Curated annotation (Swiss-Prot):
Physiological role: Acts as a chaperone.
Pfam families on file: HSP70
Keywords: ATP-binding, Chaperone, Nucleotide-binding, Phosphoprotein, Stress response
Phosphothreonine carried by residues: 200
MF-aspect GO terms: ATP binding; ATP-dependent protein folding chaperone; unfolded protein binding
Ranges of Acidic residues composition bias in the record: 621-634
Protein's name according to its UniProt entry: Chaperone protein DnaK
Species annotation: Vesicomyosocius okutanii subsp. Calyptogena okutanii (strain HA)
Family named by the database record: Belongs to the heat shock protein 70 family.
Length: 634
């Protein structure tokens, strides 16, 4: 049975881990890194798709086709405020899909966020397969605890498109708690996981208990903001640099995508440096040019300045902490330990602020970049039978219900209810002789239906004619272990039972997902062909170089005719190497190799002549020797 892998699909970076011999192993990617940038690029002059570090390296010269922070779009509608805000901040195009979702447009092709995220998941899958030496087909994938149903379903779709059966969706703070608690916590403890990542913020309060040798992890409450993270901190820094440059040089860099991409990289680097230094310098020569000539950016920035730029963002993380405590019916004094997760928590101001709020020094013995993937691997181990005596009880982050008369949301499942769970309630008709009812499913905390997230709606038809209020329609909401919702309805008066599938108001249809799965498989073949073509071209280049070098070294050893034949073969190969015809390249490589065999023979003969006198001299110097073994008496 193949391993179930654990994947942390992050906004900025992603990570993959497995259970290996009873412990968690973070798997290094092909570049030797333990985390992979969640960046996908489509080069202008190639059909190749770049993922990770390769995509990040070319971002400056290809900003409009380099996609990052796609997780912030997954499962979102184009009209949402968070999406509209992002449109002005990213160099690539965010467009409205036919179903109303937020998609991106790259090289004149519209693409769904799950389809793009699948490329990153695919890279994680390949990383695990290279390490294990076998195909991987199953995974546990993490999501922010505050992700709604649409975002969770979209993440599962991304896994499916990447060729994985997603066995479980697990909340990121819960995963981090697993990574921390399985080995490091003894006895019963109540911990807070404060997770400030690249694009999302979550806080969860988790009770860890040892019950008859079994570790129980029960989430008491969770809260957060799915559009708050390190990317927003970077944007504040970019905004400051743009303003300072405009004051100094009178040039607005926001109109220059290439300059903005350079600024983004520099801002991220400066932010990281300010976690360990009080001051840093952003130096970008030739950042842009105008009629007067090239312009250079050179700006010093202090840690205090960065803290002032992001002060309101930091404060935004405290309100969810207060709400989580209130929902769990706890105070800060009830918290035993605080765990920091997510790269942005390396900022000293974050640590200080969290410490002041909870009145406890946060634990630093968890790697904030790797803890979530480690927890996902532990959950994968539980599902695969590799990990025993661990029980995880998670919660739904938002309330679920349906719209009732007057545009009111009637909640059937309250937020922070332990999952899996289900709830049923009897509803009726609003008019006499009503033969059908529309069930509108909602997720959120507001009383007004329109202020909540619409998950979809369906019609229950064939209701018998009766006065209003008489028919009894039982609506059941069922949440599985992934936090994904299924809805059913039954007319109790007739006994007729109907299975209802919600026609989602957003998201990908089964047909679209299947098409994307097939596209991904087709591209996998294309990618493999491309890799083989590159290998052939590299071999051809190397052969041309070595043959030319040997020709020059042996110019006095070969005839003009021999030289002409070899040079003609080199020219033929140089011509065909410009094409994408692998078979033609391989044929010409074989021809040149055969022709160059003459050179190899002459080179060996020449080397033999040079070595003979030395070899003879060496043989004269050989004498027998007696060896005495010296024993060490130590």
């Amino acid at each position: 049975m193949s391993k179930i892998i654990g994947i942390d699909l992050g906004t900025t970076n992603s990570c993959v881990a497995i259970m290996d011999g009873g412990s968690v192993k973070i798997i290094e990617n092909s570049e030797g890194d333990r985390t992979t940038p969640s960046i996908i690029a489509y080069p202008k002059d190639s059909e190749e798709v770049l993922v990770g570090q390769a995509a990040k390296r070319q971002a400056v010269t290809n900003p409009e086709n380099t996609l990052y922070a796609i997780k912030r779009l997954i499962g979102r509608r184009f009209e949402e405020d968070a999406v509209q805000k992002d449109i002005d901040l990213v160099p690539y195009k965010i467009v409205k899909a036919d179903n109303g979702d937020a998609w991106v447009k790259v090289k004149n092709k519209k693409m769904a966020a799950p389809e793009i995220s699948a490329k990153v998941i695919g890279k994680m899958k390949k990383t695990a397969e290279d390490y294990l030496g076998e195909e991987v087909t199953e995974a546990v994938i993490t999501v922010p605890a505050y992700f709604n149903d649409s975002q969770r379903q979209a993440t599962k779709d991304a896994g499916k498109i990447a060729g994985l059966n997603v066995k479980r969706i697990i909340n990121e703070p819960t995963a981090a708690a697993l990574a921390y608690g399985v080995d490091k916590v003894k006895g019963d403890k109540t911990v807070v996981v404060y997770d400030l990542g690249g694009g999302t913020f979550d806080v969860s309060i988790i009770e860890m208990e040892d019950i008859d040798g079994e570790k129980h992890f029960e989430v008491l409450s969770t809260n957060g903001d799915t559009f708050l993270g390190g990317e927003d901190f970077d944007q504040r820094m970019i905004g400051y640099l743009v303003d300072e440059f405009k004051k100094d040089q009178g040039v607005d860099l926001t109109n220059d995508p290439m300059a903005l991409q350079r600024l983004k990289e520099a801002a991220e680097k400066a932010k990281i440096e300010l976690s360990s230094s009080e001051q840093t310098e952003v130096n970008l020569p030739y950042v842009t040019a105008d009629a007067s000539g090239p312009k250079h950016l050179n700006i010093k920035i202090t840690r205090a300045k960065l803290e002032s730029l992001v002060e309101d963002l930091l404060k935004r993380t405290i309100e969810p902490c207060k709400t989580a405590l209130k929902d769990a019916d706890l105070s800060t004094g009830d918290i035993d330990e605080v765990i920091l997760v997510g790269g942005q928590t390396r900022m000293p101001k974050v640590t200080k602020m969290v410490q002041n709020f909870f009145d406890k020094e946060p634990k630093k013995d968890v790697n904030p970049d790797e803890a979530v993937a480690m927890g996902a691997a532990i959950q994968a181990g539980v599902l695969g039978g590799d990990v025993k005596d661990v029980l995880l009880l998670d919660v739904t982050p938002l309330s679920l219900g349906i719209e009732t008369m007057g545009g009111v949301m009637t909640k059937l499942i309250e937020k922070n209810t332990t999952i899996p769970t289900n709830a049923s309630q009897i509803f009726s008709t609003a008019a006499d002789n009503q033969s059908a009812v529309t069930v509108h499913v909602l997720q959120g905390e507001r009383e007004i239906s329109s202020a909540n997230k619409s998950l979809g709606q369906f019609n229950l038809e064939g209701i018998n004619s009766a006065p209003k209020g008489q028919p009894q329609i039982e609506v059941t909401l069922d949440i599985d272990s992934d936090g994904i919702l299924n809805v059913s309805a039954k007319d109790k008066n007739t006994g007729k039972k109907q299975s209802i599938t919600i026609k989602a108001s957003s998201g990908l249809s089964d047909e679209e997902v299947e098409k994307m799965v097939k596209d991904a498989e087709a591209h996998a073949d294309e990618d493999q062909k491309f890799q083989k073509l590159v290998t052939s071209k590299n071999m051809a280049d190397a052969l041309i170089h070595s043959t030319k070098q040997t020709l020059d070294e042996l110019k006095d050893e070969i005839s003009i005719d021999e030289k002409s034949v070899i040079e003609a073969s080199i020219t033929d190969l140089e011509k065909v190497i410009k094409s994408d015809n692998k078979e033609a390249i391989d044929t010409k490589v074989k021809t040149l190799s055969e022709k160059a065999q003459l050179l190899a023979e002459k080179a060996q003969a020449k080397a033999g002549v040079k070595n003979t006198p030395q070899e003879e001299k060496n043989s004269d110097d050989v004498v027998d020797a007696d060896f005495e073994e010296v024993k060490d008496d130590k």
